[in-house]
Amino acid sequence: MKLWTWKRENLPSLSHAFRTAFAATISILLGRLIGLPEAYWAAIATVVVMQSPLGTTVPLAIERIVASALGASIGAMESIYFGANLFVFALAMLLLGLISFVLRLEKVGYSYACITLAIIVMIPRAETPWIAAAHRFAEVSLGILTALAVVAVWREEQRLFENTTAN
């Protein structure tokens, strides 16, 4: 009995690990350079985007940026008018699902919107909700754009064991 299955193209490689580490580090440095208060969100977004298959990286990146904007906006509005009310939080997640359906965002976009919403609403902050939302959107967008730049410039090499199978 197998505990898991895998596809050859989804296996990590040494070059992928280097690219991901490089991209995440660059995104944190850029975030700090431009004064983003929690630049680690840029690194998290970079790591997530770096795991996407090459053919879907750009469309998913655009979707993630749109979804982050939605989650940040609805999160800021919820925080201003209702605080961290769990019932309203659940309604906001439902609303994001409906908006995602209308905009034809895939589940990955919907999950990004919900994660951003949760970060804005559930983490107590000193700054106003709109400032927190703007920071999260900027940090996540920076991470996504950094990943896209690294993927475009640093192509991943072929794996050493091309004929490996999951049998």
Regions found by a protein language model. Give the residues of each.
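Alpha-helical transmembrane segments and their membrane-interface boundaries
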Residues: 1-167
